[in-house]
Amino acid sequence: MKLKVVHRPVDPGHLEGLRTLPPVLARAYAARGIDGPGQLAHTLDRLLRVGSLEGIADAVALLLAHRRADGRVLVVGDFDADGATSSALIVRALRAWGWPEVDFLVPNRFEYGYGLTPEIVDLAAVRAPTLIVTVDNGISSIAGVAAARERGIDVLVTDHHLAGAVLPDANVIVNPNVPGATFGSRCLAGVGVAFYVMSALHRALDDPSLPSPAGWLDLVALGTVADVVPLDHNNRVLVAQGLQRIRAGRCTPGVRALLETGKRSLPGLVAADLGFAAGPRLNAAGRLDDMSIGIRCLITDSPTEALALAARLDQLNQERRAIEGRMQEEAIAAVRHLRDPDGDSGRGRRRHGLCLYDPGWHQGVVGLVAGRLKDRVRRPVIAFADAGAGELRGSARSVTGVHIRDVLDAVATRHPGLLGRFGGHAMAAGLTLPRDRLDEFAVAFDAEVERWQAGGSLADRIETDGPLAADEISLATAETLRAAGPWGQAFPEPSFDQRFRILRTRTVGERHLKMWVEVPGAGRRFDAIAFNFFQGREASEPVPEEALLVYRLDVNEYAGERRLQLLVDHLLE
């Protein structure tokens, strides 16, 4: 596939409103729709009104009713970082605010699958809850909610996933993505929804002696970044506030332990550190073991216990990386030999969507493999693993312009009975499928993705902020951009492109390419690194003497010294 570099358009009117900022930063902000300082304010008073989220007043009333009745609250979470931070936030808040009995339950993904299923309700019923609160799940749990209500258990669904045609018969639903919702942002993560519910509850309690939910914004920032939801202005406020508290050392022992285990310095923390250091360690529990380890890490007030649990999470993350590395190599090899839906060899027409399956793949890691491969082939990818009983469980990752959950919905509509359960977002989704219908599904999926891309694929394009002048490629510029975040999904960290002469290279850690480069004619040389450059490549593959690099500016801290480093995302001849 030939990739095309395109520059993000910059509205001159937006630039005018940002003229007091450094030019590189002003261009980056303007290209992301920022037209003035007001959109850069990250104070809590810039959040969308708590009361404007549909269902929130009813949620508060339900929670207060169970407190008055000395009821038992059971929080049922998802098995990822968003679910873990959501669970920890609500458990911490309710316990701190006087609810007599609050506990959590997170389903083992390998035994129970996703969401509030009837089987999970059976498990929950042993604890005799009067109220189940779902976090980061529940909007598709029709049967599970019904099972709970039949047992006389009230259900409060807090979720952010897209709703299906039928909603569960919960007592209350709080979800900015239900049909007809008018809340000003559809981008809240599950932990963002949980924060809004707890903020409304705290206001209703009207007791200044109770700790503010703002004290747990470190959890909100971690879950929001780790779940890769779009960083609209509302989410940027939540993340910025959480980062501010972490940098000042005002964070939960668990978040501190996860970051210290990941060798991150709290004072200089940026959003990417949450996504690359804390998030994967937390997610590793749900992928390989039991997410209750992660939730316990986030709930404990003991620094010693938090460090011990973080060490266990780090061990699981190392195991996950080893499993993922093997699966990734197998997936790359499979793509090379993939046959097209019409039976021709891979040299035939180009597939639009890829489905991959290996009987030895791990259920908890297929999502990571799909994501890595999607970045490599720049097409939607679904990776499948065996789920037992003749069923496959798949994890889908998509590219810009292809709403993967809607693609699956269209496949289900055109081919009734082909899919089992499915759900998700624009960029990620999960599904189940009979193993003997995988080939049939692969054809249907490819055709549906092709329909979505009928106007041309956006995935073949690499968007950048254009070239930098030689004197703009500097540590000062890198420091400015680093401090200007939070950057993330739908508000990407600035990247640039231009031709460099590659003076010298060496391989680092078997997969990474270290380079020393210079801008032709400028006489300035820079350190650069392309992570995972040799993933799927031969180490002996030659590197050109000159290339178009798509890169970001990074501050490399080592032995107390801060130096500029170029992070190379693409090397194009």
PLM feature spans:
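Active-site cavity-forming subdomains of large catalytic enzyme subunits
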Residues: 122-187, 191, 195-207, 211
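Acidic-glycine-rich active-site phosphate/pyrophosphate-binding loop
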Residues: 65, 162-175, 255, 517-522
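Mid-to-C-terminal polyanion-binding domains and interfaces
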Residues: 65-71, 233, 237, 305-311, ...
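A short acidic, amphipathic alpha-helical/loop segment
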Residues: 143-147, 369, 476, 480
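Histidine-centered active-site/metal-ligand motif
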Residues: 160-161, 362, 425, 512
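Flexible glycine-/small-residue-rich
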Residues: 77, 135, 157, 175-176, ...
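A residue-level signal for conserved active-site and pocket-lining positions in enzyme catalytic cores
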Residues: 29, 133, 283, 481, ...
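Hydrophobic helix-and-loop "lid/oligomerization" segment in the mid-to-C-terminal part
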Residues: 8-130, 151, 203-436, 467
